[in-house]
Structure formats: C-alpha cells, structure tokens
Amino acid sequence: MMNKLIGILSIIALIVVVLSIITWNNNMTMEMQNSKNETSITNETSAEKETNTTNETEIVNEANTTSEEEIKSSNSQTGQSQESATVIQPKKGQPIKEFEIVAKESEIEFKQGITLPVWTYGGTVPGTEIRVTEGDYVRVNLTNTLVVPITIHWHGYPVKSEMDGIPGYTQDAVLPGESFTYEFSADYIGTYWYHSHQESSKQVDMGLYGALIVEPKVKPDIDKEFTLIFDEWMEEYEEDMSMSMPNDNTNDTMNMDNESNTSETSGMNENNPEMEEEKMMKELYNIYTVNGKSGELISPLAVNIGDVVKLRFINAGYRSHGIHIPGQVVKIVSTDGQNIMGAEEIKDQIITIAPGERYDVEFVVQSDQSFVIDVHDENLYNDQLKIPVVVDGESDKILVEDITKELLNFDLSGYGSYSEGQFTIDQEYDVEQGIELNSKVDNNKLEYTINGTTFDESQPITIKTGDIIKLTYENKSLVDHPMHLHGHFFQILSKDDIPFTGAPIWKDTLLIKPGEKYVIAFKADNPGNWVQHCHELHHASAGMMQKIIYSDYKSSYTPDPNNTVNKPE
C-alpha cells in the first residue's frame, strides 16, 4: 500500500515539474517578443528622427506595406506639438508616400535684378511638389519654422474634413515651432494644389503654395510633362490689404464721406469701390510669374518632334489669365483634375484659367518650329508671362505671336462628347439654394458678400449625407468671382439658363463673371464641416465665404472660442 502511495506522489511531482517547465518557456517567449517589439519601436523612432533631421523637403519614405500597429506607433513617436486627427488608416498592403515639408523663409529672384523675401513650403516657390500614384496613402508632415501660424489646405482634393486645413474650423493653425501631420488616400487622379488657409490672401501672396499631382496607376502615353503655376507679386508688399477704401482724395471722388454706414455697390459708375479696388490691385501687383520666375528667367520647355506633351496649368494667383498655345492642335483633357470625355481638338483659342482653377492640355509636337506660350490679358504685364517651347534644341528660332491678335475664347459649355450627366436641371433636389454674389461698403470698408452677408454673419447651408444639392450662383457685382467648393466635385448644369450640351463638366472652382448665372449640383458624399468661398482670396478675406455643414456629422475637433490666432479667411 505504501509503495502504491509513493508511486502516485512521484507521478504528481513529475507533472508539477513538467508544468513549471512549460510555464517558464512561455514566459521567456513573451519576454523575448516584448524585447523584440521594443527594439523595433526604438529603431523605428531613431530612423524617423534621423530622417526628420536630414530630409526636410524631400520624399522621406516609400514603404510598400505598413501595419496598423506600426502606423499608430509611428504617429505616437513623431513628437508633434499639436495632435493630428487620425480619421483614416492605410489599408493592408497600401503603398505609403511620406513627405517632410518645412515652412521656412527664403529669398527668390523672380525677375532679373528683383529678389524678394518669401514664405515657402520647403524653401522654394512653388513649394515641394507632392507627386503620388493613385491608390497611395499620403502622409505629409508639416513643420512650421515661420514667425506666423499656417496650415495646408488641399485645394480641390476631397480629403476628410479633419484634414482640410481650415483654422478654427477643422483644426487649429500650426503655430511657429509646431508640427502637424496631414493624411489622406490618393483615390482621385488629376492636377490639384495645396496652400495655406490661414490669412490666405496674405500667405498665398507670400508664396505658401505648391502642386499636388496624382498620377494614374496605368501611366498614359506621355513623352513630356510640365506643371506651370501662374502667380502675381508685389515688388513692394503692402502689409495692409484689408480692402479699406482708398485715400481721402479718392473717397471724395466717390462721395463716400456723406454716405450711410452700409450701402450696396452694384450698379454704380466707374468710381464704384469695386472698380477702384481693381485698379489699385493692378497697380500694386506688377510682377507676373510662372513657377516663380518672370520674363527671361522662365525656364524653356524642351520637347522633340513627335512628342506627346502634357501641360498642367495651375492658377495660384488672384487674376485670371488667357492662355494661348500658338499653332498647336491641342486637347483640353481635364479641368480641376476631372477628365473630359471625348476631348476635342482645338487650335488658337484662348483658355481662360481663373484663380484656383486647373487645366490639363495635351498636344503632339508636329513641327520643328519653336514657339512661345503666351497670355492675352488686359494688363501691362503680358510680356512677363511668355513660356518658350524649344523644339529639338532650336532655341534661336522661336516664333513669337502677336499677343494683341483677337482669338476665339474656349467654351466649356459644349465641349467634349455629350452624355447625360449624373444630375439634370429638372430633377428633384433635397436642398436648393440661391447664392447671390455682391459687395457693400460698411463703415468706409469694402466688403464682399454672399446673399448680403459676410462670413461672420452668413447663414450656413445645412445638408446631410446622401442629399442631392443644387446651387444657383448669380454675380450681381462688377468684378469676377471664382467660387471654390471644399470637399466635393460639382457638375455644371447651365450658364445663363442655357444647359451645358457637351460632356458632363465636373469642377471644384468656377469662374463667375459680372452678370453671369450658373447652376451646379453635387452629392453630399463627404461628411464634414466645409466652406465655399471666392478664390480671389482678397474677396474671401473681405467676407465672401460661407459654411456648408453636414447635420449628421460630428467633428473630432472642437474650436476654442477664445482663440484669436485662427483666421480662416
């Protein structure tokens, strides 16, 4: 009996020993894994710090795959002064393109003998080009070394609302010395651009903008491609561009001193405040640039006979420009990043590009004759915007056209292959809103208005996810208003009550000239807090801006009502 008991106890002891060994092995395995994970995080952080130190303006990472856990770890290790809202994550296996952009002061020679101080994204004007491929996950780490708060707005690109870069509305402005990370998925191909939306009329004026190009996965048959960004500069920058009325003598001419505090300005004579302001702006802005260079400093475009050439035009300035590509048979293949079905060949027509707009133009070089892309504008500075196109290196045989010659104006309303668009004039809409664009003088200050009110006073347009919205714009003022809608593409339905008859035209920025009426439609498919505004940014800063709010959306950002730094106009 005793021997039997001893045997049982021996078996129990053996089992205990085995269990102890198993437990010890498991603990060792977990410790080794934890140690490995800590080493991985440490290495990742060290590499990231090294990258941030040595690569301020260039692409710094193109990892093929990154797990969600690594993304969260990376975000937690960046040392950002302001927490960036994480509203999306890369999909498993989604390529990641990461950019480091440092906002910094610099000096740029715009014109021979004229060098000006500028604010830049990455030390150049235009700023660092962000070029990605359809399907990429894009991460842009912005560091602000300027003396002013800034943001980045992705003009025309439907990012999530938290990434839209509107200070005091979707985020706080990025203060000097702080950083912010913008993230979005590159789901829409085309030509876009980015710029600061903090005091944008001043900051874009100072150079805070750059190109955003999303290429298709399947590369088109293009031999040469050029991005051309138009802008205007003041040789002597005016700090106060607040749209105050001109000096006392001009006020006497306009008889403003005896006017009431508030008055509408439409329908007045040539001494109308709007026209006086336009005249003043033309005098102040006296340097016109392409890619930050004017006149003889503009780099020639080198092409060869037979090349398929793509030109991406972006207007980052405050004035519209009439672009002419002389002697070439061209196709306008997209506007505001949106392809035009059945793009037709045209020749020697003026393509008007308004502030904020983009046009992609393609043509085949069919002659060895070098030529100059010029502009047909109503100003004194057309000679500053001549872009040489040198064919087969023949730079001494450039044909220069007469820029005073009258040419046809390109018309989008009947361009491309007709097909029924997503929306029609007569269908039912969930929300219909009239948008009257005008101006008024209030306390001797010129203000630009939407439906009679400025941004601070305006009533938002309230929509909800899934709504179909129709907006009718009427320009009752005497100056152009290129209206820009954030977060959405819209279809143009009609101009001056005449329906569009060509391909469906989709845009995010629309030039509305004095007296014109446009009807557009879009679907509420990007929940968030958005705005629309005039992209003559001086007009936006003077009040022509309006909120568009999704009633079924709750933002992760809560603005501080006591914050006086954020200035979204």
Where are these regions (language model features)?
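N-terminal Sec-pathway targeting helices
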Residues: 1-14
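Hydrophobic single-pass membrane-insertion segments
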Residues: 20-33, 286
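N-terminal, intrinsically disordered, polar/charged segments of Gram-positive cell-envelope systems
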Residues: 27-90, 239, 244, 249-266, ...
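Predominantly extracellular/luminal regions of secreted and cell-surface proteins
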Residues: 88-108, 226-248, 268-273, 414-443
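Histidine- and aromatic-enriched segments that form or immediately flank copper-ligand environments
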Residues: 98, 102-215, 320-351, 371-383, ...
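Histidine- and aromatic-rich segments of cupredoxin/plastocyanin-like copper-binding domains
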Residues: 163-166, 172-175, 273-411, 497-501
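Low-complexity, Pro/Ser/Thr- and charge-rich linker/hinge segments at domain boundaries
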Residues: 216-230, 236-239, 392-415, 552-565
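Acidic-aromatic/histidine active-site loop/patch
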Residues: 225-307, 314-317, 440, 448
